[in-house]
Amino acid sequence: MDIDYTVGEVELSYKPKFKSLHQVTCSEDAYKYLLPTYKEGTICYKEYFKVLFLNQAKQVLGYTLISEGGITETCADVRVILQAALLTNSVAIILAHNHPSGNLKPSRQDMEITKQVKNAAQLMRITVLDHLILTDTGYYSFSDEGEL
């Protein structure tokens, strides 16, 4: 019996739409980049987990939506986050998700996913600079609060 040893080719690509010349130097900068990624009326509707990708100079390469959840939670896969970071040649990332309730306090699950991503990213020499919890009126920064 003959075996067909043909395999499919995997193509990976990243097509930047713009070149940001601005550095993300603090959590407020990250918030200002991330807030406009929410369509009007959606930040209070349900949870979305997003990642902001940065180069060596901490300039924004882009962002991606990792997951879309319900009113009280969303599930983020560490592998999907790191896959996107590797595809964009990111040196650093900023995790972000919103709390539709407006409560800025991180949950136990928020703390756990932050730890998991940070530990996995370290193996790839990618730095998790922050994890922001966003609302329409403000944000919570894991980095600013010493939780990273």
Sequence positions of predicted segments:
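Active-site-proximal loop/helix of nucleotide/amide-processing enzymes and allied scaffolds
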Residues: 1-16, 32, 55, 72-148
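Glycine-rich, small/polar surface segments that engage phosphate groups of diverse ligands
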Residues: 18-80, 84
